[in-house]
Amino acid sequence: EIPQNLGSDIPHDIIKLPNGQWCKTPGALCSSRSECCKAKHSDSVTYSSGCSRQWSDQQGLFINQCRTCNVESSMC
């Protein structure tokens, strides 16, 4: 299950990237912001998407995961 603080409940566009792969959804492992799917209506300043460092209790280390958040809330 993907934690809600990664933005899994925020609608996002799943698009094919220039490298031919699909963008990664919130909670997926990533290495750069460009790999992550952007929130729908990301042309507004309401949402921000990117690849952020998160602590994984399961693995006992930091991992990079795609995240989408509402910039007007405390999620970002």
From Swiss-Prot:
- InterPro entries, per the entry: Cys_Knot_tox
Please list the GO terms describing molecular function: ion channel regulator activity; toxin activity
Record's Pfam families?
Cys_Knot_tox (PF17486)
From which domain of life does this come?
Answer: Eukaryota
Q: Where in the cell is it found?
A: Secreted
- Which Cys residues form disulphide pairs? C23-C37, C30-C51, C36-C66, C69-C76
Q: Which residues cross the membrane?
A: none
Q: Which GO terms describe its cellular component?
A: extracellular region
Q: Which UniProt keywords apply?
A: Disulfide bond, Ion channel impairing toxin, Knottin, Neurotoxin, Secreted, Toxin
Tissue-specificity statement = Expressed by the venom gland.
Entry's family note: Belongs to the neurotoxin 21 family.
What the record says about its domains? The presence of a 'disulfide through disulfide knot' structurally defines this protein as a knottin.
* Function statement: Neurotoxin with probable ion channel impairing activity. In vivo, is both paralytic and lethal, when injected into lepidopteran larvae.
Protein name, as recorded: U1-cyrtautoxin-As1d
